[in-house]
Curated annotation (Swiss-Prot):
The lineage of its organism: Eukaryota, Viridiplantae, Streptophyta, Embryophyta, Tracheophyta. The keyword Membrane applies. It comes from the Eukaryota. GO terms for biological process: photosynthetic electron transport chain. GO terms for molecular function: electron transporter, transferring electrons within cytochrome b6/f complex of photosystem II activity; electron transporter, transferring electrons within the cyclic electron transport pathway of photosynthesis activity; oxidoreductase activity. This is Cytochrome b6-f complex subunit 4.
Amino acid sequence: MGITKKPDLNDPVLRAKLAKGMGHNYYGEPAWPNDLLYIFPVVILGTIACNVGLAVLEPSMIGEPADPFATPLEILPEWYFFPVFQILRTVPNKLLGVLLMVSVPAGLLTVPFLENVNKFQNPFRRPVATTVFLVGTVVALWLGIGATLPIDKSLTLGL
C-alpha cells in the first residue's frame, strides 16, 4: 500500500483543483502545455541527438563500395519487389505483365465485397478471405523465390 500513491480526495486543496478542471494529478500540473510543449520536444530532440551522435562517432558502411568497372550479370531489385520482378521476367508480353500487377490490388479490393455479409472475425468462418490470403501468400513466396534464381533456372509459371 505504501508503494502506490493515491490522492487524498478529502483534501480541500485537491478538491479545489479538481473543481477547476486541473485533472486528477495530485500536484495539479496539467499535461497541456507543460508536458506537450516542454518535455516531449526535449525527449524527441534528445533521441535525435543520440542517433546523430552515434552516426557521426561510429559510421557503418552500407555494403561494399561500388566498382563501376565490374557490373553483376543480373541486377536484382530489393527483396520486396521480387514477386513483381518475377512476373515481369516470366511473362513474355510486357503489357500482360503490367496488367497482372494491376490485377493484384484490384482483386484484393474485391474481397470485402465478396464477404460483406459475413461479420465473423474468426478466419475459419471466413473461407473466401482465408483462401485469398493463403493462395496469395503461396504465390508471392513462389514468385519471390523464383526471382532470386538465375534466368535459365527461374520458375517460369508454365508459360
